[in-house]
Amino acid sequence: MLPPELSEDRCSLRPNEDRLCVTVEMPPHGDPTFYRSIIRSKARLTYGEAERRQAEPAIVAALELTDRLTAGMRDRRFARGALRIESPEINFEFDGKGGVARAWKESEPTAHRLIEELMIAANEAVAELLSSRKREALYRVHERPDPTAIELLLKKLADLGVPTPPAPEQLSPATAAQVAADVSERVMDYVRRSGRGVEAFPSLVLRSLKQARYHPENLGHAGLASRAYCHFTSPIRRYPDLVVHRALLKELGLSDEPPPADLEGLAEHTSTQERAAAQVEYLADELCLGWLLDATLYERGWDDPFEGEIVGMIASGLFIRFGDVFEGYLPVRRLTGDYFELNDLGTAMAGRRGGRMYRLGDPIEVLVEKIEKAEGKVELSEAGRTRK
């Protein structure tokens, strides 16, 4: 991230001020063009504000064509084999004194989908140009999944009663990617229709895939079903985007700046830093949720149970999502009435004697036993039993 003076002022799209840009112009039919440009934005809006403004009569007509275009782009992306997994992010509201006032999950607004499709198209166009001319840059690559991982995913989903496509007798990486895309669509459809496994089943699909990363060569992006992909649209937020901008401008004859000397090392470094930043973000979410849960229990009482969903399991216990945004750990030692063992697929925990079973995606009622706010850890116990 650039210093705030640059990222929030000099390089930021401030309303009614000129800013230097690089434009990707993409006609519905024909090749894209790339050029330096100047932009003067009229407003700085959050996605929520943009969503509300879209209903204004003067804006409806202007966005109607854009909506149709981006909807078509989205449909074509899924038709060519892009993954269809929805993972709503947790949003926080703070009280102005450093405390967390509330947290909620929000489905993707229309304004976000519109911007997302245009950014994907721009990123693809730039990557296609650089790749076709064998230019060095930092590509965003997502390699095809390991066939054995997809075979295991199919077995897990079948064991959980989730409809899956028939698996080919032999899976190559290419067919594994196609099966993964098909599975992602079926899982999301099943979750919407049944209301079961809302958190657990999409997570199973994601964990069966390889991680996206940066690489100096174009290896394609399986998740987006893109032949070539890069990060181009956020040069004030991500360093790889800045490298791509420089590569594009050099290719267009608008800059003489050479590419970095060690692109391979830079790709590894930026990929590592991205994962580290994601881990910090996850920890920050856990800490905020721990404090919010403690405040919530202070008001409602610790004896009031939560409805939850089993979203993960290991031999020593269950991971539960509850209260929509909170997550906690239910140790197996707190499961009473039997001795429970994890099955070979890691999809269920069954009692040796009575046969009582806990499965991924099952509902479960829990009580909070302990919160370690400094670590964001929550320990749970079972308030009621899942189905037998």
Write out the residue ranges for each language-model feature.
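Conserved, carboxylate-rich catalytic/transport cores that coordinate ions
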Residues: 1-388
